[in-house]
Amino acid sequence: MERFRLEKKLPGPDEEAVVDLGKTSSTVNTKFEKEELESHRAVYIGVHVPFSKESRRRHRHRGHKHHHRRRKDKESDKEDGRESPSYDTPSQRVQFILGTEDDDEEHIPHDLFTEMDELCYRDGEEYEWKETARWLKFEEDVEDGGDRWSKPYVATLSLHSLFELRSCILNGTVMLDMRASTLDEIADMVLDNMIASGQLDESIRENVREALLKRHHHQNEKRFTSRIPLVRSFADIGKKHSDPHLLERNGEGLSASRHSLRTGLSASNLSLRGESPLSLLLGHLLPSSRAGTPAGSRCTTPVPTPQNSPPSSPSISRLTSRSSQESQRQAPELLVSPASDDIPTVVIHPPEEDLEAALKGEEQKNEENVDLTPGILASPQSAPGNLDNSKSGEIKGNGSGGSRENSTVDFSKVDMNFMRKIPTGAEASNVLVGEVDFLERPIIAFVRLAPAVLLTGLTEVPVPTRFLFLLLGPAGKAPQYHEIGRSIATLMTDEIFHDVAYKAKDRNDLLSGIDEFLDQVTVLPPGEWDPSIRIEPPKSVPSQEKRKIPVFHNGSTPTLGETPKEAAHHAGPELQRTGRLFGGLILDIKRKAPFFLSDFKDALSLQCLASILFLYCACMSPVITFGGLLGEATEGRISAIESLFGASLTGIAYSLFAGQPLTILGSTGPVLVFEKILYKFCRDYQLSYLSLRTSIGLWTSFLCIVLVATDASSLVCYITRFTEEAFAALICIIFIYEALEKLFDLGETYAFNMHNNLDKLTSYSCVCTEPPNPSNETLAQWKKDNITAHNISWRNLTVSECKKLRGVFLGSACGHHGPYIPDVLFWCVILFFTTFFLSSFLKQFKTKRYFPTKVRSTISDFAVFLTIVIMVTIDYLVGVPSPKLHVPEKFEPTHPERGWIISPLGDNPWWTLLIAAIPALLCTILIFMDQQITAVIINRKEHKLKKGAGYHLDLLMVGVMLGVCSVMGLPWFVAATVLSISHVNSLKVESECSAPGEQPKFLGIREQRVTGLMIFILMGLSVFMTSVLKFIPMPVLYGVFLYMGVSSLKGIQLFDRIKLFGMPAKHQPDLIYLRYVPLWKVHIFTVIQLTCLVLLWVIKVSAAAVVFPMMVLALVFVRKLMDLCFTKRELSWLDDLMPESKKKKEDDKKKKEKEEAERMLQDDDDTVHLPFEGGSLLQIPVKALKYSPDKPVSVKISFEDEPRKKYVDAETSL
């Protein structure tokens, strides 16, 4: 009788795979379906139905067999004590599974490394498990003859092997959340379950166990046999190559392993304590038997089960094999057929609280006496060669079990280069397939460990194992077993099935994951594709998020890539108008202040040093050139030394206190044009140029502060990609144009003879002679120097002396401005283009195949600086006198009549202080547009900046420093677009550990203040570094300009659309906007943008360049007019959506909420189905529902089809 009661309580074959419920196993009446549905934010409709006989629908009696089938289906839907909701498709079930939120950390998905081992002969003598393939992201195979790993490739699977895998999961052993610490325990639990379910005959148990515990031979072992063993603790290697809290994050891995090990020890001592296993099992499975038992006399001995019992408890295994037999739905007959008509038994783990209580007293008795020989992380049978077992006998079972310090790994047999590619916190999935001669039919097992356990020697890298898949079968079908192993390994790398495997609660969840995967696969005809061809990994892997989105009841599916981008452009908090004086500035300071210290700590990287050296060389030349041009325009009032000092002072202050320190300040063309116009005006009206300029600068600074106070930077939200790209493209083109222009200007200075007669080279000469008709200026110069033309030996003068004395060059080797200079121009051309191509090549060196990853990454970071060093060295060795960078040697004002402090009034009339406000207004627009457009480009969302922007704080710093520079008589500096883009590009951060074959992922920008700060500090110290800087050839710096201009063009969508004009439709790239916008409209959008770009270019290079900022502002209005030609959806793909009025936003929001409500209530047949516990189904016509988002969500539903027209209250929770 006692045995009969036990069998009634043991699970039957209808219940699903072995699941360790942990602490919830003792909860009997928990409604799991409600808890899980609440986590999905589902819509609940509560219906109050009167209890009357008339309301019940009468069904025709269909016989006893029909009711028996209904009861069976209902029972089969209950899995692990929960009622599983019904689903129409596997995709819906998968979406439900992925939506569950588990409280424990054991079901949180981790990155997986999958390894497949096959059972094979070693040297024709004995079996061993040999590694044949591995997956981190893509598949890598061990080449048959080359004894090496193949290149990573996209795994191609046969459809038949996928169906065979599904049959394996359907008919094989599935054990979820197994608690085990060694491979021996795992093997014993799996084999016990197989014997209990009838899948394996007990007579061949030892043969299978011996095969499972064979040695594992990994591909990398041969390469490391000659290396001196380097034995360190696993904790040490974890600090560098893996997550230091890996095992703790995976559900307190070590402590759980120790707990499981103590459970096994306690279970093995049952006979010593004289307790009956049957009574213990009844004590756990029958709570009522303990109801009247005092706490003191309560059973404190843990219960061994097939999941946690060692092989010393066969009686328990035999007990669990007794279960009720019910017919199951026959699976398709493939390679693997069911072992019997019943699915393997479900075994319930005892509550974890009882196990801990049972062990409490036992630990106190055995703390000093128990000695664990195999240890926790080591199994002698699993890997005798991969462990240092000298200390295994010292690991005590004192409540702490083994520790990471005591568990050593022989790293002489670990491929550390591959270990670096494994993400932190990753876990392992082991696939074991093979053929043996003692099996008549295949045996299959899918095991999920909880927590993951480091089974040293099982995997080629020391990563904790989470999943195990076993397939052993009779000889003769090894290729089929191999393909099934590849199928499950490839499935584990699939993003969706990977998550399903972690969150699955039963076998049906795994089958749904496979079915969902089959729904997504593409079959290639065998006659049109050779499966042996290895597909190269794609540059970018498509997102799988659309597979996680539930399908609406009306059948439509909202895919992420096919919905227009409704989010407003620049909708972040940085550009929200506060309505308070200096409100935006205060928020910027609050936003950036917490990151101030990290802005300096985050610069501790070699990449920042490379960026400093690159940008220093790139900024020096334009600043000095701008100062030289300004000196020519102002007759030395402001020149190179003032430009260097102003750039250094402004840049240091901006880098320290600005909201976006990634922005680099520099000089701009419109500022130079403005300076020229102002100087000409002052000279014509005999005004003091520096004083009037100071007045204008102070007014401009004041107006910038007013813009900051009124949150005017919030207007930046109207600057969309249309304006950004036109402005950025123009600046890039100007950089390219000016670089080429400066190269051609060298042709005037270093002229060469294009009409040489090689036979008369000996007769060519060029001498200095007396000017035939000296000008009055020349005569005045001679008189001042107290010389006459007759006293000068003209033919003996050098070129510089001849030019100083205003002599004339005569001869066949003379040009218009002096003698021909051989080789210099051509050498400059060589330096120019070599610098450009070498910089581009070294920057892309990171993706080459030569040298280790670290070397390639360092070369790529220092690409421009290395190029400059190489070209300077070559120029020095060749010795051709190329033009060099000239830096002022003294720190003093260029003009002797000025100082470092300028009065705003000076010698000018008082009214000039008031009149200066008019040009200051134009200058303010210039500064505002240049600064904010550059800031918008830097703060683009594709740069993935994490510390936020600070538009108001940026403008404040520029305005304040503009006033300081005006008072000191220094040039004005504002954000430089190309330099800032180059600065951002030099600080890009990519993922360090990328799977073989996978492209590194862009993580963001290294946001810090040190690079900008050091660039401008070095610029200020350049006066003291002239002895080094004088060796830099100017053509090399021009080549750097060309490189910055060309590299900044990358990523500008305008140029991608320009290329479409010359491409036939079939050769056009798969650009996202070409899917949803007609091609002719794309061309119209491009033509409009290109026209605006040409107009900006014409204005920029003309005398009207001072109004250039006004034209940039006009682009915003042009973009606004484009709303008349394009739809909102088209503009969302081609450009960013412009902000709309507040009223229109509210109307659109209400309209969208209404559409969402209607879509959620709509079904294929316009009916809402409400299932009840008795199996009945209530159907509510949607047309009878009246819903309004503005009213309370309690409505009346009339059932017109019912005889008495009853009314039901429906409460909806949306």
UniProtKB/Swiss-Prot annotation:
Highly expressed in testis and spleen. Also expressed in retina, colon, small intestine, ovary, thymus, prostate, muscle, heart and kidney. Transporter activity is regulated by CA2/carbonic anhydrase 2, cAMP and PKA. Insensitive to stilbene derivatives. Inhibited by 5-(N-ethyl-N-isopropyl)-amiloride (EIPA). GO terms for cellular component: apical plasma membrane; basolateral plasma membrane; membrane; plasma membrane; stereocilium. Electroneutral sodium- and bicarbonate-dependent cotransporter with a Na(+):HCO3(-) 1:1 stoichiometry. Mediates the sodium-dependent bicarbonate transport important for pH recovery after acid load as well as for regulation of steady-state pH in the duodenum and vascular smooth muscle cells. Plays a key role in macrophage acidification, mediating bicarbonate import into the cytoplasm which is crucial for net acid extrusion and maintenance of cytoplasmic pH during phagocytosis. Interacts with CFTR through NHERF1/EBP50. Interacts with USH1C. Forms a complex with ATP6V1B1 and NHERF1/EBP50. Interacts in a pH dependent-manner with CA2/carbonic anhydrase 2. Belongs to the anion exchanger (TC 2.A.31) family. Induction: In response to growth factor stimuli, mTORC1 activation, through the RPS6KA1-dependent EIF4B phosphorylation, stimulates SLC4A7 mRNA translation (at protein level). Strongly induced upon macrophage differentiation. Residues 1134-1136 are annotated as: CA2-binding. Residues 630-637, 717-725, 839-861, 930-954, 1033-1034, 1114-1214 are cytoplasmic. The lineage of its organism: Eukaryota, Metazoa, Chordata, Craniata, Vertebrata. The gene is SLC4A7. A motif (PDZ-binding) lies at residues 1211-1214. Residues 55-72 have a biased composition (Basic residues). This is Sodium bicarbonate cotransporter 3. Disulfide bonds join 766-768, 802-814. Glycans are attached at residues 171, 269, 398, 406, 776, 786, 791. Residues 1127-1214 are annotated as: Essential for cell membrane localization and transport activity.
